[in-house]
Amino acid sequence: SNELNVKLRSPINEILPHLESMNYKLPAENDQAAGTSPYTRKAPYHYGWDWGPCFVTSGIWQEVELFGWNSWFIKNIFIRQEKCDKDRADLTLEVDIESKNNKSGKIIIFEPKSEIFYEHPIKFSKGENKLYFDLVVVKPELWWPAGHGDQPLYDFQVTIHADGEEEKFSKRTGLRDVTINRVKDEKGESFTIYVNGKPIFAKGANWIPAD
């Protein structure tokens, strides 16, 4: 049988030796834990807030999955939106593959809502590989922030056949255009978020979890 051990280290104690060797410090006004918060990927309120205590914890907070593979597998897929409007969405699909040997096969890309179906022969080599494919969605259903419209999603499904093996990977995403308009004026410079050509007020609240 196999035994899987998970070691959890202190976010503060792990960073402190690095802080001592650096000749500069990053700002951490609310940090009650020796100024380590800018160097860890944790919510700032973990390090103390105006009414919140300093509890810098570590733990497993999502499901754990043990993944096994033989000669190759799909590590991930990414969808980059090059251009998107109500008439057309130009996308680049990146497929990351890791392999123990050089392989050849075919890839099938399918998205049911847009009826995209793409099949093409591929080759990948030993080690990490990145494959890129250009896709077009005609008349896309645009994604909007809450209160401004619907949030339709597209499911991109990738299937690869190589040397008698089959691997599948899917990614769900919304299609939208997001830009930040920065125009100099008499007070400085604007910072307006536009989604699908519409200015959006980015509202929020300065609140940390009560529990």
Residue ranges, per PLM feature:
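Secreted/periplasmic carbohydrate-active enzymes, especially glycoside hydrolases
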Residues: 1-211
